[in-house]
Design a protein with these regions (language model features):
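Hydrophobic targeting/anchoring helices
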Residues: 18-126, 135, 376
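Helical hinge/lid and interdomain linker segments adjacent to catalytic or ligand-binding clefts
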Residues: 21-31, 61-71, 121-229, 234-238
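Catalytic beta-strand/loop cores that center a nucleophilic Ser/Cys/Thr
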Residues: 126, 133, 230, 260-384
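Positively charged n-region of N-terminal signal peptides that target proteins for export
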Residues: 1-4
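N-terminal signal peptide c-region/cleavage motif recognized by signal peptidases
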Residues: 13-16
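Extracellular ligand-binding/catalytic regions of CAZymes and related secreted enzymes
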Residues: 19-25, 31-62, 242, 342-421
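Serine-dependent carboxylesterase/thioesterase catalytic core
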Residues: 206, 214-217, 229, 233-276, ...
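Extracellular/periplasmic catalytic domains that process cell-envelope and extracellular macromolecules
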Residues: 106-109, 150-153, 215-216, 365-367
Length: 421
């Protein structure tokens, strides 16, 4: 009987001292930062209580200590540490101290994720689908039919990537107008627009952009990268205006369309000038890609700094900036970064390069919802070109640039707190 009591005591003592699993997220403490987000999402799906410890050891995640959680971490190669109640309570008390720029944010549910992408695209065709697949975070692919039939309300989070909402087919005409893939994509877009009841691709894409705008205003979260950022705003500001040259839509553009642009309709950008030349691979002067092509910004100098926010007063931008480094290497895309003087004052700069006069990572609110724009195509492929092989994320499990994407994936799971900035 005494032996039985001792065994029970030891068993209970062990679990009283080991009731939390911490996924450390600092630079040296985590073998696979990206898959740690996948573990956190998985735990939310399992309805475990999960917390995000902002600014604590790189933005660590706190989960309950169960055999299932430990096993899943081991299977996915994610570093974890086990803490007793007393030790974790001391840490949480330290985090809550007014003198510490840290905060505990409760994650309530696994957000339903939609990725806006044409049918038949592979996961490596954009950085978000690639990292979601790698992190084992489930998502649903949707495209114009689903958006126009009001299916966005089924999702908490929407991602847009290598898209052109202006109807100019990515401005690839100058370099690729005779390429089979360009001809096929143009034909497919025209057929889709006709099937959905539109005379032009530009009109159909504006309708899609308007539905997405309404989704955000109604409380949705939108995350856009690469050309989906500026082309989205351009489409909204050019509503009712023909900005497409004949090779794109079969008729002349409005002669004075620049003067007709209504910047009030945009989410993030102001006072931009559109690129009228169809041979130029650029939408407007929002984008700063040309500074790299001209050699003004060299690859070895291409970095951006993440801003520092008050975790207790500004938990939203703090969540979006969680990382194990404050300096993140840059990467090019069709839209690489945003000229600082073209960004509205109501928009928060999350990551910028002041010397270059550009922001890479920005965030704002629209109605009841929020949006985040992130310039560039692939955080681990500096100059991704058409036809390049996909990035192998097993070689970049600790990528700071990809972490920023995954911050946005988990962000809608957080218990809502009012932004005070």
């Amino acid at each position: 009987m005494k032996k039985y009591i001792v065994i029970c005591f030891l068993f209970l003592s062990f679990y009283s001292k080991a009731s939390f699993v911490l996924l450390p997220m600092e630079a040296e403490g985590q073998k696979n930062h990206l898959k740690a987000y996948g573990i956190t999402y998985w735990a939310l799906e399992k309805q475990y209580k999960v917390s995000w410890l902002l600014n604590f050891r790189g933005g660590s995640f706190l989960l309950p200590d169960t055999d299932e959680v430990r096993k899943e971490c081991q299977i996915r190669g994610v570093t974890f540490e086990v803490f007793s109640d007393s030790k974790m309570n001391a840490i949480l008390e330290e985090i809550s101290s007014p003198s510490q720029n840290m905060e505990t944010v409760v994650l309530e549910k696994a957000p339903k994720i939609a990725v806006y992408t044409p049918k038949g695209k592979q996961p490596w065709d954009d950085a978000v689908t690639m990292v979601l697949t790698y992190a084992e975070i489930p998502y649903t692919e949707i495209y114009d039919e689903e958006v126009l039939s009001d299916q966005l309300i089924l999702y908490d989070w929407l991602h847009l990537h290598h898209e052109d909402f202006t109807g100019q087919y990515g401005k690839f005409f100058g370099a690729y107008r005779n390429a089979p893939w360009y001809i096929e994509q143009k034909r497919d877009a025209e057929n889709l627009a006709k099937r959905l009841g539109y005379n032009k691709v530009s009109e159909e894409k504006l309708a899609v952009a308007s539905k997405i705008r309404d989704y955000v205003i109604g409380g949705g979260f939108m995350f856009a990268m690469c050309s989906a950022t500026d082309s989205f705003d351009i489409a909204l500001t050019a509503e009712g205006i023909d900005i497409c040259e004949p090779m794109f839509d079969g008729d002349e553009s409005d002669a004075n369309y620049q003067a007709l642009i209504d910047y009030r309709n945009s989410f993030a950008f102001k006072d931009f000038n559109l690129e009228r030349n169809p041979m130029v691979y650029e939408f407007s002067d929002i984008d700063t890609t040309n500074d790299r092509q001209k050699g003004i910004i060299k690859m070895e100098q291409d970095y951006f700094s993440l801003m520092d926010f008050s975790a207790k007063w500004d938990p939203i931008p703090t969540m979006l900036c969680q990382n194990h480094t404050q300096l993140v290497k840059g990467f090019m895309g069709q839209t690489t970064a945003f000229a600082s003087d073209k960004i509205k004052s109501s928009v928060l700069l999350l990551g910028e390069n002041k010397i270059n006069g550009e922001a890479r990572y920005i965030h704002g609110t629209k109605g009841k919802g929020m949006f985040t724009f992130y310039g560039g195509h692939d955080p681990e492929d500096y100059q991704h070109r058409v036809g390049d092989a996909p990035t192998v994320l097993d070689l970049h499990p600790n990528s700071p640039g990809y972490r920023l994407i995954l911050n946005n994936v988990l962000f809608p799971a957080a218990r809502k707190k009012k932004l005070k900035t």
